[in-house]
Every structure is written in structure tokens, then in C-alpha cells.
Amino acid sequence: MNPPKSAPDAQGLSYRDAGVDIDAGDALVDKIKPFAKKTLRDGVLGGIGGFGALFEVPKKYREPVLVSGTDGVGTKLKLAFHLNKHDTVGQDLVAMSVNDILVQGAEPLFFLDYFACGKLDVETAATVVKGIATGCELAGCALIGGETAEMPGMYPDGEYDLAGFAVGAVEKSKIIDGSTIAEGDVVLGLASSGIHSNGFSLVRKIIERANPDLSADFHGRSLADALMAPTRIYVKPLLALMEKIAVKGMAHITGGGLVENIPRVLRDGLTAELDQHAWPLPPLFQWLRQHGGVADAEMHRVFNCGIGMAVIVSAADADDALRQLADAGEQVWKIGTVRASREGEAQTVVV
């Protein structure tokens, strides 16, 4: 065995030699500070760069309850790498968490992100974070911190992973938990912008089988752009709706589709019966169904099928809620009703 080289004979190593570029990390921070600054709102104490981010809960809350959520973008990132398209996945990241905490009535207050890669590409990372900031602006929350982890050997060059963390607040007396949902209530469906951020393992399998030209026109934009459309953020229109109407329950339609997410807000003994003809199946989902040979039941269990958020209100409030959401720029339909469950029946059925 050769003895180890003595320190005087060995060439000195640096962090850069090990694959970590501190200068690139500093350059990224400089690039993203203006994006984060645009998201600042009341409650933010201090700026980016501290060990911890500080936020003061708004004084309008008498009994504030903090609501937190965390999520990623899933294998939609694999398609982003393939297309070298990184400007929309940041909004996806924010949407997945803020829409989740919104369903309990929470106003998103702040957001943090985690960006992990093997080798940091400053331009790519800055593009992603700009999208995160855009999402935060749409949600009305502050991007108050984050972590960029350059970890040589952990990820292939050109690839990265994302995680996001949102914290919001709701008045204790106004928490929405589905406990008041009753027979006869109406289920409203708000349109999605596309696939959002779930089901992309199946999407990628369908693309592999169909081998389409992703640059080809698809209803006025490229198929690639249709597939990568960022997840819609429903925060502002739904917070406004909650100010005027008693929203009984909401479900963010993510992994599991309509049939597995709506039951999360229903009490035992209740079923949401959805009419699949009450809203149009968007062309992109028709394309996926056709080229993947995907059964209807599987479509409803994997994809949002055009509905990104379900909102449950009383029958008396349904028309008013429809009107308010439409006035706020949302496409919305009455997609079903709540009734008593039949023996052995699932809590959400699509007929």
C-alpha cells in the first residue's frame, strides 16, 4: 500500500475542486433578490440572507391559526429538463402548497423554497426562482427565504429538484374543515389551466408511446406549452368569495384526481355525485386519453380532467358563488351535488 502523500507534496484542494462553486451561489443570490423583493408584503421583518426569516402575523387576526403545507413539482421536472423550459415550474411549486392551505380557509402569508442540484447553473436556477416569485405574487404571499443546495454527484448535470413550503393564517372561528357539509349542497368546479403538477409519470409514458412532435401546434400553442402550463393559483378569487359566502368545503384536485380528493373534506355517510357531462373535458385530456388508451375511471383517478379546485356551498348560495367567481375571471361550473352515501359506495362517484 502506498503511503498517503504528505501535505507539502499534495496539491491543495478547494471546494470548487470538489464540485461546489461558492461564487456561483453568491451570483444566484444577487440575481434573485429583485424577484423576492417584488413579493414583499406587510408582516415581513428583515430581508433575505439571515439565518431565519421573520414574519409578524397580521394584527387583523384575533385568534390566528397557522396553516402549513409542503410539496414539490414531481416528475413534471423531467419534462422541463427535456424541453429546457424552466420558467413555469416555479409557479407550479408555489401553487401546489398555497392551494393546499387555501382549502382550510387560510390566507397564504409566506413561502420558502428548496432548490437542489448536482452542479449549479445560475441562469437556470434564476429562471426557476423568478417563476416562484411570480407564483408568490399571484398568491399574495412573500418569498422570504430558501435554500440552494449544490451537491456534486447527487443529481445528473442539468437536473434539479424542488420543494416548497407555505405558511398561512386563518381565524380560528373560520377554519373550513367540511364539518358543515350536508345533503343537498352543491359542488362547484373551477377550471384548471391544464394538467397542473400531478400525473406526469403517466403523461411521460404516453409521450414515450405516442412519440408526438412536441413543437407542433396544439389549439393555438405548442403541445409542449400545453403540457407545461403552470398550475393555476386560486387564492385571490377564493379568499374574496369566502368574505361574502359561507364556503363549506374545498378540495384541491391533485394526485388522485376528483375521486380521491373530494372525499378528504366529506364526513362519513356523505357522497359527492359528479356529472362528468357538466363541464367540457379539455382537448389536452382528450389527447392523453386517446394516445394512452386510458380508461375513464383511470383518468378521473389520476388527472384533474379540467377541474383544479372543487368548492362546496349550500344550494341557496350556489348561483351567487358562480356569479362571483365568474366575475373574478374564473371558469366555473356546477359539477355535482352532495347526497347520502349508499351502502358500499365510494364517497365521490362520477356518473
UniProtKB/Swiss-Prot annotation:
The keyword Nucleotide-binding applies. It is found in: Cytoplasm. InterPro entries: PurM-like_C_dom, PurM-like_C_sf, PurM-like_N, PurM-like_N_sf, PurM_cligase. One of its GO terms (molecular function) is ATP binding. Its EC number is 6.3.3.1. CDD domains: PurM (cd02196). Pathway: Purine metabolism; IMP biosynthesis via de novo pathway; 5-amino-1-(5-phospho-D-ribosyl)imidazole from N(2)-formyl-N(1)-(5-phospho-D-ribosyl)glycinamide: step 2/2. One of its GO terms (cellular component) is cytosol. It catalyses: 2-formamido-N(1)-(5-O-phospho-beta-D-ribosyl)acetamidine + ATP = 5-amino-1-(5-phospho-beta-D-ribosyl)imidazole + ADP + phosphate + H(+). One of its GO terms (biological process) is 'de novo' IMP biosynthetic process. Keywords: ATP-binding, Cytoplasm, Ligase, Nucleotide-binding, Purine biosynthesis. Disulfide bonds: none annotated. Belongs to the AIR synthase family. This is Phosphoribosylformylglycinamidine cyclo-ligase. It comes from Burkholderia pseudomallei (strain K96243). The gene is purM.
